[in-house]
Swiss-Prot record:
Official protein name in the record: F17e-G fimbrial adhesin
Annotated family: Belongs to the fimbrial protein family.
Known function: Essential fimbrial adhesion factor that mediates binding to N-acetylglucosamine-containing receptors in the host intestinal microvilli, leading to colonization of the intestinal tissue, and diarrhea or septicemia. Also confers adhesiveness to laminin and basement membranes.
A GO BP entry: adhesion of symbiont to host
Organism: Escherichia coli
Keywords: Disulfide bond, Fimbrium, Lectin, Signal, Virulence
S-S bridge residues: C75-C132
């Protein structure tokens, strides 16, 4: 009788200890701060290289490996959502607005920053596909990290951002797992910080107003529509800080909306059937006119130098062109402005 009892007890214990149930509990905090408080970050960049991402060299973020305790085959993934307004994009990733001058790039995911998902838009999205714990106890964590973005310059070169709510991450049970009444969503706020912004630029060595005397020609030198003759030339020279790439835009001062490659003649001109084109250096394609703006990516903006040149220059050639409307001799006057963008 005694031996039978011992065998029965051993079998009962074996069966008992192999029974497990998927379970989850919340062990984190519902409200979390991203980044150290009252931090100050400093960077130097070309004046018009905007938007400019402040890569501080380390992660401004929050990570916690122990937010939910899971066991018994529980399956969990993560979804993330950003509540800030989308004010632009960079390489397919949303730029979220903090102030008129400062934005954020945001990543959300599991505990490891390097696996974070670049956030876009304002809808919930999968930021961690998930996993299923075995017959043991483990934890599920999360992380959020950000990079500030300068959107526009200000006169003080300093930008202050107050504490701001960013968004949320929620735990997503799957494969039959259920969270029940367990807290599934945690929220994040960005701690206040200051950006100290030093910009580099160039100085124009050429006079800001350049008069190009146009050579006198005869109508016979432009017999057909599209024919061209060199009328004059000039150069633009600058002195630049190291690392600045210069871009430029020519604008038709008489017709600012002109986006063609033929400069509008002023009202003082008496010749008809002829226009002016401008070429740079040895290019065979004329420059097109664009808006009077230094903004990066401005329409018909063209590259004048690379970041390795500290004394860049460009030679401009002005050519008469037969516009195909029948040439009547007279005076030819045109005004173009040039706007530099320091990127």
């Amino acid at each position: 009788m005694t031996n039978f009892y011992k065998v029965f007890l051993a079998v009962f214990i074996l069966v008992c200890c192999n029974i497990s149930h998927a379970a989850v509990s919340f062990i984190g905090s519902t409200e979390n701060d991203v980044g150290p408080s009252q931090s100050s970050y400093s960077r130097t960049h070309a004046m018009d290289n905007l938007p400019f991402v402040y890569n501080t060299g380390y992660n401004i973020g929050y990570q916690n490996a122990n937010v939910w305790r899971i066991s018994g085959g529980f399956c969990v993934g993560l979804d993330g959502k950003v509540d800030l307004p989308v004010v632009g994009s960079l390489d397919g990733q949303s730029i979220y607005g903090l102030t008129e001058e400062v934005g954020l790039l945001i990543w959300m995911g599991d505990t490891n920053y390097s696996r974070g998902t670049a956030m876009s838009g304002n809808s919930w999205e999968n930021v961690f596909s998930g996993w299923c714990v075995g017959n043991y106890v483990s934890t599920q964590g999360l992380s959020v990290h950000v990079r500030p973005v300068i959107l526009k310059r200000n006169s003080s070169a300093q930008y202050s951002v107050q504490k701001t709510s960013i968004g949320s991450i929620r735990m997503r049970p799957y494969n039959g797992s259920s969270a029940g009444s367990v807290q599934t969503t945690v929220n994040f706020s960005l701690n206040p910080f200051t950006l100290n912004d030093t910009v580099t630029s160039c100085r124009l060595l050429t006079p800001s107003a350049v008069n190009v005397s146009l050579a006198a020609i005869s109508a016979g030198q432009l017999p057909s529509s599209g024919d061209e003759v060199v009328a004059g030339t000039t150069s633009l020279k600058l002195q630049c800080d190291a690392g600045v790439t210069v871009w430029a835009t020519l604008t038709d001062a008489t017709t600012p909306s002109n986006r063609s490659d033929i400069l509008t003649l002023t009202g003082a001109s008496t010749a008809t059937g002829v226009g002016l084109r401008i070429y740079k250096n040895t290019d065979s394609t004329p420059l097109k006119f664009g808006p009077d703006s230094p903004v990066k990516g401005n329409e018909n903006q063209w590259q004048l130098s690379t970041g390795t040149e500290t004394s860049p220059s460009v030679r401009l050639y002005v050519k008469y062109v037969n516009t195909g409307e029948g040439i009547n001799p007279g005076t030819v006057n045109g005004i173009s402005t040039f706007t530099f963008s320091y990127q």
